[in-house]
């Protein structure tokens, strides 16, 4: 993998992030804490991402549901996250209009 000058991160990480600018993402900093917001910009020096309309999220896992689920949110507006502190980034997909119609009807 080609390495970039910014902290030794592969350039493919930046390409993946840049392709998702404008989409809603969940950046997980540790197993129980992260931020959910709209990816607005990607920086290479320092390596990081800017999120807008951001919520700080607390996640919990149980024996019955081992994949952590968001259990609480708190408004945080805009935030910069250094990529060195992020464990995982998930791109969140929009809800299907069919599911939304069934839920509201």
Map each language-model feature to its residues.
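Conserved RNA-binding domains used in RNP assembly and mRNA/RNA metabolism
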Residues: 2-105
């Amino acid at each position: 993998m080609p390495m970039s000058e910014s902290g030794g991160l592969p350039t493919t990480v930046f390409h993946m992030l840049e392709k998702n600018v404008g989409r809603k993402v969940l950046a997980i900093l540790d197993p129980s804490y992260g931020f959910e917001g709209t990816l607005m910009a990607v920086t290479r020096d320092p390596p990081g991402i800017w999120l807008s309309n951001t919520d700080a999220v607390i996640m919990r896992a149980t024996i019955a549901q081992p994949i952590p689920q968001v259990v609480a949110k708190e408004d945080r507006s805009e935030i910069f996250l250094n990529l060195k502190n992020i464990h995982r980034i998930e791109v969140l997909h929009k809800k299907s209009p069919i599911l939304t119609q069934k839920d509201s009807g």
